[in-house]
């Protein structure tokens, strides 16, 4: 079933705010994708090739996951608004924050190791 046929249309302000939030997730995903590609292509002396490629792959995979998460979150919020339900709570933000923290620690370790 198409989302536009579900329930009744929410106030446009809320629907557009939901869309802006989705686009923010996409921008963030594109940033991680650019970081992964940049690390692989523009930093050949950063750590060992295996570690550099593994970290670049991790950043690119995280980018794809964020893009999908952004869409699924948009969809859940849109359904909830159309059905006049409470917006769903998510624990995923904690998981995303922890993954980002791990990547940051790895990068800091590699920078200190390479320097």
UniProtKB/Swiss-Prot annotation:
Assigned keywords, A-Z: Cell inner membrane, Cell membrane, Membrane, Transmembrane, Transmembrane helix
Subcellular location: Cell inner membrane
Gene: yidH
Family to which this protein belongs: To M.tuberculosis Rv2272.
Periplasmic side: 52-53, 114-115
The organism's taxonomic lineage, starting at the top: Bacteria, Pseudomonadati, Pseudomonadota, Gammaproteobacteria, Enterobacterales
Protein name: Inner membrane protein YidH
Signal peptide start-end: none
Cellular component GO terms held in the UniProt record: plasma membrane
Residue ranges of the TM segments: 31-51, 54-74, 93-113
Membrane topology type: Multi-pass membrane protein
Cytoplasmic-side segments: 1-30, 75-92
GO terms classed as biological process: response to oxidative stress
């Amino acid at each position: 079933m198409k989302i536009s046929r579900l329930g009744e249309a929410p106030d446009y302000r809320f629907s557009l705010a939901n869309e802006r939030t989705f686009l923010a997730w996409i921008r963030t995903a594109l940033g991680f994708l650019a970081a992964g590609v940049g690390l692989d292509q523009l930093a050949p002396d950063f750590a060992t090739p295996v570690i550099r490629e593994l970290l670049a792959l991790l950043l690119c995979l995280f980018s794809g996951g964020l893009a999908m998460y952004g869409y699924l979150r948009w969809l859940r919020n849109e359904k909830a608004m159309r059905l006049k339900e409470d917006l769903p709570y998510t624990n995923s933000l904690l998981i995303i924050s922890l993954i980002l923290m791990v990547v940051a620690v790895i990068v800091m370790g590699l920078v200190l190791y390479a320097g």
